[in-house]
Amino acid sequence: MWKLKIGAETARGDGGGGGGSETWLRSLNNHLGRQIWEFHPELGTQEELQQIDDARRRFWERRFERRHSSDLLMRIQFAKENPSSANIPQVKIKDTEEVREEAVGMTLRRAINFYSTIQADDGHWPGDYGGPMFLIPGLVITLSITGTLNAFLSKEHQCEICRYLYNHQNEDGGWGLHIEGPSTMFGTALNYITLRLLGEPEDGMGAVEKARKWILDHGGATAITSWGKMWLSVLGVYEWSGNNPLPPEVWLCPYLLPCHPGRMWCHCRMVYLPMSYLYGKRFVGPITSTIQSLRKELYTVPYHEIDWNKARNDCAKEDLYYPHPLVQDILWASLYYAYEPIFMYWPAKRLREKALDTVMQHIHYEDENTRYICIGPVNKVLNMLCCWAEDPNSEAFKLHLPRILDYLWIAEDGMKMQGYNGSQLWDTTFAVQAIISTNIAEEYGQTLRKAHEYIKDSQVLEDCPGDLNFWYRHISKGAWPFSTADHGWPISDCTAEGLKAVILLSQFPSETVGKSVDVKRLYDAVHVILSLQNTDGGFATYELTRSYHWLELINPAETFGDIVIDYPYVECTSAAIQALTLFKKLHPGHRREEIENCIAKAAEFIENIQASDGSWYGSWGVCFTYAGWFGIKGLVAAGRTYKNCSSIHKACDYLLSKELASGGWGESYLSCQDKVYTNLKDNRPHIVNTGWAMLALIDAGQAERDPTPLHRAARILINSQMENGDFPQEEIMGVFNKNCMISYSAYRNIFPIWALGEYRCRVLKAL
């Protein structure tokens, strides 16, 4: 049976997969927030094992209708470890029945009682942060190349990865970019290769053969995207001459160039950094019999007859979210024909070697400053591969191995690689605000105390070492990360939400929620937020916007949009306004003028980027309902109202126009990729969208004008609650880079609690 381990206990043992040990793990705070799964064959009662088998069977049977796991393995474990003693009857409200405060209060207590049982001992809420389907392949390819696949991933790990891939294979035989997406060559070719590397035969369960047919029917693997071409090249089933150039020498260019990688969005920068190393070395792993076989399986013509030059720009129409503009094709052709032939030979090759050394310096800096977690799963495995390519026996490679487990999560649909090492801090700050909104927070002092400790101990206390300008890093001291302090990358909205949470908790007695954060640390957080405001008033994610929008012309990733620079977002900007406004109320004398100017500019930015129909586009959640919540909440925090601000007026009208006839809101991920509001299939409501819309409208004073939509939405949330106080997992609600969805599994609990809490206190009690 699989067991979730948290925090310090994760450093004991090897994660059940071999290769990891306490010797090769580093931590700033005793692994706070770390979450790994271990397999223990002796664990589990017959009843628990049957529960797990039943959950797996139900997922398989409904896999084409319900793509998202319900995170049941974790819930089964916590039900045994933290049983709830509360016995509050379930509430259901008929369509003709009035929503009463008593019913809302009972629903909230049942919800928080349950949610408290799935809180980890260290104070955060673990959960599934999967969704993308292109992450596990990079890991399996890297482990296969380095000869550590079977040594590091146990047969149980490999079995669960195969289960996950089979569960999320589409009916046509392919795999999408994410669990709810239609089949793409990127997803299908990579996951097909993954199954083969894991030992599945060419006709495995009929599904492998079906996947190969999809690949061949769509032109073969030469039509995979540029990221896919890179992975296939290092594996040895595609030639480097079929890639557009990624010259590492760009890292030697002066920073004043607008296209310098140091000016790019950090995720983009940190992915193309190791890619440029592998490209510059033309690195290829061992050519095994499986690799030889894959060369025959993946293409419509014999491998030696493929026109690799033509394949450089070949991309399946199913993958083409961001087609290459002409200027990009000209750039790649120039580098391919004129630049690369020179730098492959002496004397220019000496400059390449210098560039490769520089790239490896930056890779090691990233590794060391994230305790070998890295900023995300893509550069995690790429950096690990680069360390092995540099020296297979290096300490750096050994330090990478145990941190793989930080990214692996298991649910009833199998084992997946998450989009980060978790969403620990982010979810915890939202959970705190949700519980506090209910006005019954004192009843859950132990839950809040543990969450408070987690948030306090996850704040980044030091800047990265060395010259930050040389390493292209922003200040970190005082910031909060998305996940753990060991990860450590500072983020604007995480810092804002962390600051909001600790300020709100400071209003409670320390006997209830623990000691407040030292005021100097609040000042540090404010300093980070103020330092991240761009000249247009907006806030980006990790850093200031360092270059120009036109740089997107050289975005080589056909699958993703707006990845080259760190753009300002309504979500990040709103969070900054909210945090600074809250801070200013308690500490009015600290940098008052700077804070007021920052808030004013940020509010103006939010107004300026609003669409003419009253909407904002959500870049990190689905989609217009998510952004609408942030947009309205930010403007209200800045002092705007429905009466004196046309932006809030228009935003409310927009949200109300999207309310479903049955009540509530239900927005499809298609809104993100198509940039047009799209309802879920059959116009179903979604509890998370409904929660966001409710919170936005309540903040904008909808209860004073017409509370009817709020009553209907509250009824949806109350009636959605499950018998044990949990809420159902519905469609995927997270997004990044416009086109890829990601799971925020905690949202199903957080936002019904938050919305009903605000509804109870600000709507029902105001009537």
Curated annotation (Swiss-Prot):
- Biological process according to GO: tetracyclic triterpenoid biosynthetic process
Query: Does Isomerase appear among the keywords?
Result: yes
Leader sequence segment: none
PROSITE patterns (alphabetical): TERPENE_SYNTHASES
| Catalytic reaction list | (S)-2,3-epoxysqualene = cycloartenol
Molecular function terms in GO for this entry? cycloartenol synthase activity
- Which SUPFAM superfamilies does the entry mention? Terpenoid cyclases/Protein prenyltransferases
Q: Which UniProt keywords apply?
A: Isomerase, Repeat
| Keyword Isomerase belongs to the record | yes
Q: Report the domain of life of the source organism.
A: Eukaryota
Task: List GO terms (cellular component aspect).
Answer: lipid droplet
Q: What class of enzyme is it?
A: isomerase
Spans annotated as Disordered: 1-22
> PFTB repeats: which residues?
158-199, 522-567, 599-639, 648-689, 710-751
Q: What is its EC number?
A: 5.4.99.8
Q: Where is the active site?
A: D493 (proton donor)
InterPro entries according to UniProt: SQ_cyclase_C, SQ_cyclase_N, Squalene_cyclase, Terpene_synthase_CS, Terpenoid_cyclase/PrenylTrfase
State what this protein does.
Oxidosqualene cyclase converting oxidosqualene to cycloartenol.
Sequence similarity: Belongs to the terpene cyclase/mutase family.
Question: What protein name does the entry list?
Answer: Cycloartenol synthase
Q: Which organism is it from?
A: Betula platyphylla
